[in-house]
Curated annotation (Swiss-Prot):
Top-level division of the source organism's lineage: Bacteria
Taxonomic lineage from the root: Bacteria, Bacillati, Bacillota, Clostridia, Eubacteriales
Name this protein carries in UniProt: Galactose/methyl galactoside import ATP-binding protein MglA
Family annotation (Pfam families): ABC_tran
Organism of provenance: Clostridium perfringens (strain ATCC 13124 / DSM 756 / JCM 1290 / NCIMB 6125 / NCTC 8237 / Type A)
Cellular compartments annotated: Cell membrane
Catalytic reaction(s) noted: D-galactose(out) + ATP + H2O = D-galactose(in) + ADP + phosphate + H(+); methyl beta-D-galactoside(out) + ATP + H2O = methyl beta-D-galactoside(in) + ADP + phosphate + H(+)
Membrane topology term: Peripheral membrane protein
EC numbers on record: 7.5.2.11
GO MF annotations, alphabetized: ATP binding; ATP hydrolysis activity
């Protein structure tokens, strides 16, 4: 007998792929009008379970009930037509079409033989008004922020009269203010009786927005608890199967002499303004700042992705020319980019290709062919030294968890033996267990005398991993502090130092929310 309070019941779901049991007898029950968080390390089976719900995968065994009725969706369209929607982490929109086109694509309202644009506009406006979404239905999607694109996807789910909406890492690219707006929308949906399945690695958010939390590990159901009964420590223990006594490894590297000096660095657009700092061998230098502080732009200018306007980059006491990425690479610089899936990996290609791509010319033989033996050897070095979990070198990198993808991205650069490693949000979208492994790896690299510059939006991460923290505000350095002696409040105040009255209103609001 099915519990009438549950809108969704997935019972004893199992799913196998060749050589892998991705789901093993998993049960998930979601109440009507609730926010039910789904948590687990990457590879725990969360996405596979949701793909079984959404008709992308078909389970080998188990049953799915919605409102007490057994369902078996043939595909995602079948799921949508029956009130199940999914807002994916990677937003899939036609950017050159307008917002309402994207909302109603493939099911335009008709007036005779023609599309009824007025009805389409009115229906879109009504949904936006109900959800407090401030977007013009006639704007091109390409003009929207990531947050606005996400709101459009949620509105699209509502337009299908969805009873269940799955949100996969919905806040991974949002500011605190945008997260707050998203939570207001989620609460409106909850009041309308819509159930939200919320997938996230951000434990603070889970505890704030969720009614119940289900935790998975290694393809199995581990626990379902009321969010109010959980703590961050208990969630971590359930997720990883052990206690993480410390969120960050011990800082046992010792910074040595100065290896890099950056003097009055500005970019050609003058968004960076006279950035100066020093980096020592074996040092981890964090870069903090609010959205718009130009942290990523600093790394891109150092690496030659962004044109330098003025200033000097001095390595081992000598000026170096990093005007192009290939020159920066020759000078011993490496950049792990913020958007791993877009700019860090070739998702549809195997691990071996992704491991050697940053150094591919060195694998060419005199005949112009690739030395497959060396490629295999070096790929195995990346897999072993980075502790990558994969069945094969030929596994498509896009099929791996975010943590394993990031390890390969770092490993490919280490094959070049860089001296300066630039890390832009290195743990974004990575679960708590894999984060600890990345922190350990960064610490080990510092012990090997690499100079490391690390951008992060997570304040505890900067304080827990770095030796010093350079704080940026509106393209300028507003202070450099010792990580062991500073506080989050000091860093936040430094982040606001150069905000203008007109240009920094949104960021100033972030300061008020955080401090």
């Amino acid at each position: 007998m099915k519990d009438s309070s549950n809108l969704l019941e997935m019972r004893n779901i199992s799913k196998e792929f060749p050589g892998v049991k991705a789901l093993d007898n998993v049960t998930l029950k979601v109440k009507k009008g609730s926010v039910h968080a789904l948590m687990g390390e990457n590879g725990a089976g969360k996405s596979t379970l949701m793909k079984c719900l959404f008709g992308i995968y078909h389970p080998n065994s188990g049953e799915i009930f919605i409102s007490g009725q057994k369902v078996q969706f043939k595909n995602s369209k079948h799921a949508l037509d029956n009130g199940v929607s999914m807002v994916h982490q990677e937003l899939n929109q036609v950017r050159e079409r307008n917002v309402m086109d994207n909302l109603w694509l493939g099911r335009y309202p008709k007036k005779g033989l023609f599309i009824d644009e007025k009805k389409m506009y009115d229906e879109t406006e009504k949904i936006f008004k109900d959800l407090d979404i401030n977007v013009n239905p006639r704007d091109k999607v390409s003009t929207l922020s990531v947050s606005q694109m996400q709101m459009v996807e949620i509105a699209k789910a509502v337009s299908y009269n969805s009873k269940i909406i799955v949100m996969d890492e919905p806040t991974s690219s949002l500011t605190e203010k945008e997260v707050s707006h998203l939570f207001k929308i989620i609460n409106k949906l909850r009041k309308q009786g819509i159930s939200i399945i919320y997938i996230s690695h951000k434990m603070e958010e889970i505890l704030e927005i969720s009614d119940e939390v289900t935790i998975m590990r290694d393809g199995k159901w581990i626990a379902t608890e009321k969010a109010s009964d959980l703590t961050m420590d208990l969630i971590i223990k359930l997720m990883v199967g052990r206690e993480l006594t410390d969120r960050f490894p011990k800082k046992d590297h010792i910074p040595k002499e100065t290896i890099l000096e950056v003097n009055n660095l500005s970019d050609a657009k003058n968004e960076l303004k006279n950035v100066s700092f020093k980096l020592r061998k074996g040092e981890i230098l964090g870069i903090a700042g609010l959205v718009g502080a130009k942290r990523t732009e600093t790394l891109e200018t150092l690496f030659g992705l962004r044109e330098k306007g003025s200033g000097d980059i001095i390595l081992h006491g000598k000026k170096v020319d990093n005007s192009k990425p290939f020159k920066a690479m020759q000078n011993g610089f490496a950049l792990v980019t913020e958007e791993r899936r877009q700019t860090g990996i070739f998702g549809k290609l195997p691990i071996d290709f992704n491991s050697i791509i940053a150094n591919i010319d060195s694998y060419k033989t005199s005949t112009g062919l690739l030395a497959n033996g060396r490629i295999s050897k070096d790929t195995q070095w990346v897999i072993d030294s980075m502790k990558v979990k994969t069945p094969s070198q030929k596994t498509l990198i896009g099929s791996l968890s975010g943590g394993n993808q990031q390890k390969i991205v770092i490993g490919k650069w280490l094959l070049r033996k860089p001296e300066i490693l630039l890390l832009d949000e290195p743990t974004r979208g990575i679960d708590v267990g894999a984060k600890f492994e990345i922190y350990q790896l960064i610490n080990e690299l510092a012990k090997e005398d690499k100079g490391i510059i690390m951008v992060s939006s997570e304040m505890p991460e900067l304080l827990g991993v770095c030796d010093r923290i350079l704080v940026m505000s509106n393209g300028r350095v507003s202070g450099i502090v010792n990580a062991n002696e500073t506080t989050q409040e000091e860093i936040m105040h430094l982040s606001a130092k150069y905000l203008s009255v007109t240009g920094g209103v949104n960021n100033a609001n972030q300061i008020k929310e955080k401090v």
